[in-house]
């Protein structure tokens, strides 16, 4: 796979959700019905925007295309530029998108709230003219199914198309896209929902989905601190993620996805086992430390 002949660096076009994430980190076990002491981080969020920032941090030349209400667009461009991402934020009237999460003292998500109605109004005609046609394309599933499918089909030009699951509720939008994808990263719940096989182990889920991807495509299925799997049409490997004290589990999957996608472009001949090990290490590094400096700012 190639990122495109015009790029001196590995070149990526990322498209999807880009908004503000607010994380409230509880300092002790939650007490319902009471005010709980917490610290807050405000970050550039959205699966696609997070992956874009990780790809840029790894040395990629990254372009991002997303939407915001007109008054919010300049600030999002500035935030992504600070992470090394060249952003095109298209104006779209509507509610400001955002995500808020309450995290337990163990670093695990307690409850999240997503206000994403703006993304439901995105149309293919708004997005497609603003994409770099030569770069490897990375998408999430925040936009409607017809937009996601149009993005996936753009791989017919010869560039690789990579996708990351966004939520169990949205992952079905990928079903008509699978044959166009060269890599797919999901958690276990998303993979089970997409395959319709809730009882299968992660290696079976990954292998079944890999069989319907584009030729040479790979599927990574993670399961938190349990076994993860990476599969192609011809085989699969499993690995236990590194054992660690979790500080920030929310967002580790985006770091893992970025690592896999970057490696597919920069080293297409890498063995599956090595790819999985590197991707899991990237997710573990994110989960074990404070929010990535390019992704979060104390507030």
PLM-predicted stretches and their roles:
Residues 215-218, 240-299:
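Conserved post-catalytic alpha-helical subdomain immediately downstream of the catalytic base
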Residues 1-65, 74-75, 240, 246:
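Glycine-rich phosphate/adenosyl-contacting loop at the front of the ribokinase-like
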Residues 56-57, 156, 265:
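Gly/Ala-rich phosphate-binding loop of Rossmann-like dinucleotide-binding domains
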Residues 136-204, 226-227:
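Conserved beta-alpha-beta core of the PfkB/ribokinase-like small-molecule kinase fold
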Residues 99-141:
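Conserved phosphate-binding/catalytic loop of the ribokinase/pfkB sugar-kinase fold
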Residues 183-185, 190, 205-241:
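Conserved phosphate-donor
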Residues 41, 65-70, 86-97, 164, ...:
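Beta-strand->loop->alpha-helix junctions that form or flank phosphate-binding loops
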Residues 2-10, 28, 78-83, 87, ...:
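Charged C-terminal helix
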């Amino acid at each position: 796979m190639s990122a495109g002949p015009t790029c001196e660096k590995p070149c990526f076009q990322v498209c999807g959700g880009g908004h503000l994430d607010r994380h409230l980190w509880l300092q002790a076990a939650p007490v319902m019905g009471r005010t709980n002491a917490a610290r807050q981080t405000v970050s550039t969020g959205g699966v696609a925007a997070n992956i874009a920032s990780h790809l840029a941090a790894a040395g990629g030349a990254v372009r991002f295309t997303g939407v915001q209400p007109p008054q919010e667009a300049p600030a999002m461009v500035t935030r992504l530029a600070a992470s090394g991402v060249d952003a095109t934020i298209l104006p779209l009237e509507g509610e400001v998108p955002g995500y808020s999460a309450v995290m337990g003292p163990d670093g695990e998500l307690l409850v999240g709230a997503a206000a994403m109605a703006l993304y439901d109004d995105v149309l293919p005609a708004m997005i497609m003219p603003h994409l770099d046609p030569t770069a490897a394309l990375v998408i999430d599933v925040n936009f409607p199914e017809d937009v996601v499918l149009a993005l996936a089909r753009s791989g017919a030009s010869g560039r690789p198309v990579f996708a990351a699951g966004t939520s169990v509720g949205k992952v079905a939008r990928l079903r008509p896209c699978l044959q166009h994808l060269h890599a797919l990263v999901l958690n276990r719940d998303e993979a089970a929902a997409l395959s319709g096989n809730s009882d299968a182990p992660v290696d079976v889920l990954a292998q079944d989905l890999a069989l319907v991807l584009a030729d040479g495509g790979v599927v990574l299925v993670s399961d938190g601190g349990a076994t993860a799997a990476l599969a192609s049409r011809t085989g699969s490997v499993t690995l236990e993620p590194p054992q660690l004290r979790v500080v920030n589990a929310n967002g580790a999957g985006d770091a893992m996805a970025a690592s896999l996608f970057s490696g597919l472009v920069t080293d297409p001949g890498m063995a599956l086992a090595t790819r999985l090990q590197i991707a899991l290490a990237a997710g573990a590094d994110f989960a074990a430390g404070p929010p990535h400096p390019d992704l979060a700012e104390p507030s």
